[in-house]
Amino acid sequence: MVKASPLGSIYTGTVHPGRYVIVVSGDTASVEVAVDTGSSVAGDTLVDLVFLPDVHPLVVDAIISEADLADCRGDALGVVETVTIAAVIDAADAGVKAAAVDVPAVRLADGLGGKGYALFSGDLAEVEAAVDAAVSRGERTDTELRHVIIAQLHDEIRDNLARELRLNYRLARRPGER
């Protein structure tokens, strides 16, 4: 992939369950050539891919940053879960482009059995629109997807989500630690 086209960045690594993931960024033409080359080489071992020429910056931030529900606007929370990393990135991008929502987290594969999930927060109508767009994108690409909308997120749950999303990390800390 990197020999076929100049890329802005490339991240690779293994994730559960025994998959190898490649994430690339750069100008649209270069990424398209790299993705075509990579998918051609991968052949039938390729599990999934997504090519987003104009991925929303909130999706990128949600992938690379710690989750932060503490400052999210609105009372509603939407959760979209997919069976692949590519599908959740695609769903998150569709959702945030369709509605005025925050994207506090997009989590990929590790500790999730290879699945991914995205969180949308905001006013109920906006979260519903974001989740609907994410679900529609999944249906168009024949992606297995689950979703739920919590209309009024309780403050205790918001506080828990603002600290750490992985339960094993939360349980390993002593009471009173964030």
Enumerate the language-model features and the residues they cover.
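Glycine-rich loop at the start of a catalytic domain that most often binds anionic cofactors/ligands
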Residues: 23-29
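Short low-complexity, flexible loop/linker segments enriched in glycine and/or proline
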Residues: 26, 119-120
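Long, contiguous binding/interaction regions
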Residues: 2-18, 32-115, 121-178
